[in-house]
Amino acid sequence: MMTVEVFSVIILVLLFLILALTLLFVLLNKRTRSFVIRTFTGLFRSKHTTSQKNFYDNLTSTLLRLSTDKIGAIIAIENQDSLESYVNIGYRVTSDFSPELLVTIFYNKQSPLHDGAVIVRDYQIVSVSSYFPMTRQLIDVSYGSRHRSALGLTEKCDAIVFIVSETTGKISVAVRGVIKTLSSNSDRLQDQIIHYLTVKPG
């Protein structure tokens, strides 16, 4: 009589053979292989696209809220060049990006986190109260220390840095050592954000 152990081994062997034959069929059949690849690629892209969309929405909302209340802020988005050395200067965290959290960080002027920058990597906050080198450029007198820091960082790497002036409430972006004022209209602002975050800095 067949023992339980022998029966279990036979079942495992059969399962392995079925899996191996299925894999072989997929590899040999171009149409099936293409379907499997498209399916898994589509799932990955769907998740990635959803994360992107949520981040764009949250960043737009954050900048508009900070702008409306004239809360000074600087938010650096890591690109291809690592910002790890600046992450280490500040307080390392791991947190989802949310308007409520960002407003809380920058709102309290008595907080040690108020003046530093927030660094974002892969749609998550990885550091708060980080500091960047100041630019040596002669810039408009209306720009403050946050703008100088944003320019200083982007002169050295491909990060995209968003700044809100606590004096005027204006929203700006710094890219490759150049600073530009952004729109205060929600739809237009989001279009600009998507442009700067998806176009490779030149």
UniProtKB/Swiss-Prot annotation:
It comes from Mycoplasma pneumoniae (strain ATCC 29342 / M129 / Subtype 1) (Mycoplasmoides pneumoniae). InterPro entries: C-di-AMP_synthase, CdaA, CdaS, DisA, DNA_integrity_DisA_N_sf, DNA_integrity_scan_DisA_N. NCBIfam families: c-di-AMP_CdaM, diadenylate cyclase CdaA. GO terms for cellular component: plasma membrane. It catalyses: 2 ATP = 3',3'-c-di-AMP + 2 diphosphate. The chain crosses the membrane at residues 6-26. It is a single-pass membrane protein. It holds the Pfam family DAC. It is found in: Cell membrane. Belongs to the adenylate cyclase family. DacB/CdaS subfamily. Catalyzes the condensation of 2 ATP molecules into cyclic di-AMP (c-di-AMP), a second messenger used to regulate differing processes in different bacteria. Its EC number is 2.7.7.85. Probably oligomerizes. Keywords: ATP-binding, Cell membrane, Membrane, Nucleotide-binding, Nucleotidyltransferase, Transferase, Transmembrane, Transmembrane helix. PROSITE patterns: DAC (PS51794). GO terms for molecular function: adenylate cyclase activity; ATP binding; diadenylate cyclase activity. It is an enzyme of class 2 (transferase). Residues 29-185 form the DAC domain. This is Diadenylate cyclase. Gene3D superfamilies: DNA integrity scanning protein, DisA, N-terminal domain. GO terms for biological process: cAMP biosynthetic process.
